[in-house]
Amino acid sequence: MKLLMLCREPRLYSCQRLKESAEDNGHQIDILDPNRCLLKLSKNAPHFELYYQVNSKSEPYLLPDYDAIIPRFGSTSTRMGCAVLRHFRTKNIFCLNDDVAFLKARDKWLSLQLLTEQGIAVPNSALSGAEFSATQAILQIQSPTILKTLHGSQGIGVILAENRKSAVSIMETLTQADVPLLMQDFIQEAQGTDIRCFVIGDKVVATMQRIGQEDEFRANFHRGGSAEKIQLTEQEKVLALKATKCLGLDVAGVDLIRSKQGLLVLEVNASPGLEMIEKTSGIDIALQMIVHIEKQFKR
């Protein structure tokens, strides 16, 4: 197969592992930055064209069609990355997470709404408009309070407000800067830990428990967190699969938390990192992703 990976940083561990696995399985793979793409729509055939420019001084060239697309772009590239994914989906080319599912997962509030609609428990959450009083809005959520920007990954854009006064100050400042925030209950009993479930298709292929640094409420690897092996219950596996399916994803990193109220889904990541979970679980996830693409291509 001829594969395309959409990625801004091809040197990242996840991109390198997927490239190695694809080539080891006999496939050709290009790694391109979606922000260096140009999409063209025309009344006359061909109606859809996609060009690529290696650098600002190079001549753009027309990209060929591929057999499958692997999206690995970050939150800052979501708009262009999803436009490129839609281009290929329009041509009936398999995308390992299409643009529709990607956009659902990348919008934190929308994803929480969709999960809740399907009866999937999430932390108590609230979203207020720019003209709604922050002082009144914060009363809907417990204190301490988690504040999250609607778009972001790797723990970036997540703030713990220790009291309501701090929460209001942060909300008013960021609202003034036109940065919308959602509010969530802080799950104190989790003590800075969560469970990452890596889902491919209809299977949870790997898991780990992530542990935040001392005095750090975020358990993300990129925030200096560590990880250890963990055995999921059957209920946790079912929940991870249900959350993935709810957003229409083929591949997902589902973050769960064990709370006093029961299992909660914190987030569903459409482009989950491989490094920490491969090293913790000892499972070759990159290979399993390539094998999943092969199965879809043969259908």
From Swiss-Prot:
Please state every residue range assigned to the domain named ATP-grasp. 112-294
The gene name reads rimK
Q: Which HAMAP family does the entry mention?
A: RimK
Biological processes per GO annotation: protein modification process; SOS response; translation
Q: Which InterPro entries match?
A: ATP-grasp (IPR011761), ATP-grasp_RimK-type (IPR013651), ATP_grasp_subdomain_1 (IPR013815), RimK (IPR023533), Rimk_N (IPR041107), Rp_bS6_RimK/Lys_biosynth_LsyX (IPR004666)
Known EC number(s)? Answer: 6.3.2.-
The scientific name of the source species is Histophilus somni (strain 129Pt) (Haemophilus somnus)
Cofactor requirements of the protein: Mg(2+); Mn(2+)
Q: How many cofactors are bound and how?
A: Binds 2 magnesium or manganese ions per subunit.
Q: Which residues bind Mg(2+) 2?
A: 267, 269
The protein depicted here goes by the name: Probable alpha-L-glutamate ligase
